[in-house]
Amino acid sequence: MKKLLKSALLFAAAGSALSLQALPVGNPAEPSLLIDGTMWEGASGDPCDPCATWCDAISIRAGFYGDYVFDRILKVDVNKTISGMAAAPTAASGTASNTTVAADRSNFAYGKHLQDAEWCTNAAYLALNIWDRFDVFCTLGASNGYFKASSDAFNLVGLIGLAGTDFANQRPNVEISQGIVELYTDTAFSWSVGARGALWECGCATLGAEFQYAQSNPKIEMLNVTSSPAQFMIHKPRGYKGTAANFPLPVAAGTATATDTKSATVKYHEWQVGLALSYRLNMLVPYIGVNWSRATFDADTIRIAQPKLASAILNLTTWNPTLLGVATTLDTSNKYADFMQIVSMQINKMKSRKACGIAVGATLIDADKWSITGEARLIDERAAHINAQFRF
């Protein structure tokens, strides 16, 4: 049985190095691995010993914490219907009608998944150990992210077929689905807290559990929207939140004179519980575990308008192309009808699509004072984690 357990854990740890795939689960035996201190000699405290003191029971470890998510499995969290848009145009030619009248429509972002979601964290790690069995730990560092999805996942909309030249109270009437939206965040302060403990030990095997919570609030550094009828890139985008984000947007939306705009900030929250099994092989401690986690990335459904000029220069207010379709001449009486107007997109709330995952890793110990842990995670994300620490 012991040989089978050793083989299974070693195979899992080796396999993870070949295919790197929530928060790290960590080695369940970690609280009891470093039993000697770099600065102070370790004391093996026994909670059943009447002469034991808290000085014997408590120790501190510190180190580096790096977590790198290459692809988190996320989806957008939106309602089934969207309000405020005008009805979709149906006329074979001419202009669209009723573009100032709101009509409830099916939300084309509903059920959409993100194509790519990356999250990188580098932090300092500090753990308070009790009786060489339980850890209470925290991390303080910095995180940044990248998100990519189809344009319909972020409600990219616009107005086509505008009659006349008055933009007041005009509402978008078409969705722009054949495009890509990319979000790059800046690097912002992040923190996490957690606890880990050994629940059961038998010889060299340890079964343990852990709980963690992490948070960060980075701002959107770059927004890139690529589609045929409208494309734009914004550095440090600003937009409308709350009731100000409702259609119709202000006429000045997207211009340099726009007011009541706010920075686009992504509020990241994640919590996780995990269970793992390890087996010590001298200096190497491989482990395998499962985790259940929930992550959310919420930007308060901020709506960001396409940049445009307040007044035309060389007959242009945006770089949007003219769309003639089957027409052979321009409609000079409705000069804004043939290209996309009042384009905007919304950063919808994103959350985990899969809650459960698997973690495999191994810890290398040196002199019972130093350790380095590598871990890979699969199913709910593809991620790698590294932790190097020492005991004081």
From Swiss-Prot:
* Record keywords, A-Z: Cell outer membrane, Cell shape, Disulfide bond, Ion transport, Membrane, Porin, Signal, Transmembrane, Transmembrane beta strand, Transport
Q: Which domain of life is it from?
A: Bacteria
Its cellular-component GO annotations read:
cell outer membrane; pore complex
Pfam families hit by this protein: Chlam_OMP
Listed GO molecular functions? Answer: porin activity; structural molecule activity
- Please name the GO terms of the biological process aspect recorded for this protein, alphabetically: monoatomic ion transport; regulation of cell shape
Q: Does the keyword Disulfide bond apply?
A: yes
Q: Which residues form the signal peptide?
A: 1-22
> Which intervals of the chain form a coiled coil?
none
User: Where is this gene product found?
Assistant: Cell outer membrane
Q: Describe its membrane topology.
A: Multi-pass membrane protein
Functional description taken from the UniProt entry? In elementary bodies (EBs, the infectious stage, which is able to survive outside the host cell) provides the structural integrity of the outer envelope through disulfide cross-links with the small cysteine-rich protein and the large cysteine-rich periplasmic protein. It has been described in publications as the Sarkosyl-insoluble COMC (Chlamydia outer membrane complex), and serves as the functional equivalent of peptidoglycan. Permits diffusion of specific solutes through the outer membrane.
- Similarity comment: family membership: Belongs to the chlamydial porin (CP) (TC 1.B.2) family.
Q: How does it assemble?
A: Part of a disulfide cross-linked outer membrane complex (COMC) composed of the major outer membrane porin (MOMP), the small cysteine-rich protein (OmcA) and the large cysteine-rich periplasmic protein (OmcB).
Q: What is this protein called?
A: Major outer membrane porin
Which species expresses this protein natively? Answer: Chlamydia psittaci
Its taxonomic placement starts with: Bacteria, Pseudomonadati, Chlamydiota, Chlamydiia, Chlamydiales
